[in-house]
Amino acid sequence: MLLASLIASTLIAQDAQVTPLMSKDLADFPGKEGLMITLVYPPGSSDPVHRHNAHAFVYVLEGSVVMQVKGGKEITLMPGQSFYEGPNDIHTVDRNASTTKPAKFIVALLKDKGALVLPPVNPTSASVSASPKLNSGKK
């Protein structure tokens, strides 16, 4: 399944569990597709600086996560709270707020069909390479 290989390896937090939930072409939005995943960050886990070039909607299920986009304020999200990341945002902080408990959240992405989920961050903004875990099989 392409979605499973798409989620197989990434710059997502070390030891994070990534579970694909669904991928769907969006007929009412030509050239766009939706992708939904769950992530479980182990205690103390964090993500490197990244971007999605997509609309990303985050919803926390368990634990707490700290999020920030470049130019924005760092916020701590608890279960039931959400976070939005726009297509031009650079996600500078993405970490489990706890060093003792895991954090679980859902991410729903609205992106260009076939586009990389985690493309390289602009080298003038930050240094990050494309993610093989979420990008395998995509051009």
State each model region's role:
Residues M22-A54:
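N-terminal targeting signals for Sec/Tat export/insertion, comprising classic cleavable signal peptides
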Residues H52-G71, P79-Q81:
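Glycine- and acidic-residue-biased ligand/ion/polar-headgroup-sensing regions
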